[in-house]
């Protein structure tokens, strides 16, 4: 999936900016990352308020092999696979994207800013 396809997919949601990240893309709205594309698969930001929708669809989280991890250990991120039907349903994708953006905003508020040592 390329950057043009990502912008096209989210047209009903509004303007997005795909940025290259590793072997995929981070998808941003007004500077906030709310989705990622890895291995041609779309993942949306999830939190405790939106997780049930992903679970009801039988979707799972984005995982990756942690650098230097032993025993095949994988890291789990708070981005969950979007249901495949959303690729062909722009209005429904827009609704899921709004929820993902809201989850990203809630997550950003919880992350404390590092304190500076003097």
Model-identified regions with their sequence ranges:
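Charge-dense, helix-prone N-terminal extensions
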Residues: 1-118
């Amino acid at each position: 999936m390329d950057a043009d396809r990502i912008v096209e997919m989210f047209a009903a949601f509004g303007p997005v900016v795909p940025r290259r990240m590793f072997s995929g893309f981070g998808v941003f709205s007004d500077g906030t990352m709310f989705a990622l594309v890895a291995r041609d698969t779309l993942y949306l930001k999830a939190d405790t308020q939106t997780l049930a929708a992903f679970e009801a669809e039988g979707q799972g989280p984005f995982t990756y092999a942690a650098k230097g991890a032993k025993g095949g250990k994988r890291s789990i991120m708070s981005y969950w696979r979007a249901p495949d039907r959303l690729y062909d349903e722009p209005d429904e994708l827009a609704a899921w994207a709004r929820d993902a953006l809201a989850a990203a905003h809630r997550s950003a508020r919880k992350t404390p800013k590092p304190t500076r040592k003097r």
